[in-house]
A protein has these predicted regions:
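Short beta-strand-to-loop acidic/aromatic patch adjacent to the donor-nucleotide binding site
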Residues: 55-66
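Amphipathic coiled-coil/heptad-repeat helices and related helical stalk/stem segments
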Residues: 43-44, 68-71, 161
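Residue-level marker for beta-strand->alpha-helix junctions and adjacent short loops that shape enzyme
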Residues: 7-9, 65-66, 91-92
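Conserved beta-strand segments of the P-loop GTPase G domain that flank and frequently precede/overlap
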Residues: 3-5, 62, 86-87
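Acidic donor-binding loop at a coil-to-helix junction in glycosyltransferase catalytic cores
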Residues: 158-166
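Broad hydrophobic/π-residue packing in well-ordered secondary structure
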Residues: 26, 30, 54-57, 71, ...
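Conserved catalytic core of nucleotide-sugar-dependent glycosyltransferases
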Residues: 68-157
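N-terminal anchoring/stem segment of glycosyltransferases
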Residues: 1-54
Length: 168
């Protein structure tokens, strides 16, 4: 697990997520190595590259991000054949016009999500709670390193894509 820190400090929300993840890992008998990285895009990229060589799976949690138990459990599922899972997060602020529009139209969207914009766009559904991602700036994600390395070798690309680097 790679956790982003600022001024050598971890957000309380993020720390709570890490503690919950450790409890779930202990219950399942799974090892979980936690490393901290400064909130610098170059350092994050280097940390990810280094751990791709040694870890089966990387779980990346940006500063201030909180993962609920269901998300943590998704991180620990096998997800055979999947390279990465991203966990959409809410962008700051409420779009009250969008909220009003949803209420007036009788939207089936959960009321607690109306008027919110997310950092990830999805397309077709793959399975329960799993969708193809069309665009993302996710601040929490999971990578099956072997699948990603295999895909990189097919494309003869040994480094992380510049697109990913720009988003960090």
């Amino acid at each position: 697990t790679i956790v982003v820190a600022r001024s050598k400090s971890c957000s309380v929300k993020t720390l709570h997520s890490i503690l919950r993840m450790n409890v779930i890992c202990l219950q399942r008998g799974l090892p979980n190595n936690i490393v901290y990285v400064n909130d610098d895009p170059y350092e994050k990229n280097e940390m990810i590259q280094n751990h791709m060589k040694t870890a089966d799976r990387i779980i990346f949690i940006d500063f201030g991000v909180c993962l609920d138990d269901d998300t943590i459990k998704q991180c620990l599922e096998p997800h055979e054949g999947v390279g990465c899972l991203v966990f959409p997060g809410v962008k700051e602020g409420v779009d009250w016009n969008l909220f009003k529009e949803g209420v007036e139209k009788g939207s089936k969207e959960p009321i607690h999500q109306m008027g919110l914009h997310f950092d990830t766009e999805v397309s077709n559904k793959i399975s329960e709670n799993i969708y193809n991602v069309t665009n993302t700036n996710a601040r929490a994600w999971m990578m099956n390193t072997k699948n990603v390395i295999k895909a990189q070798s097919k494309h003869k690309d040994k480094k992380l894509s510049n697109k990913l680097f720009d988003k960090l």
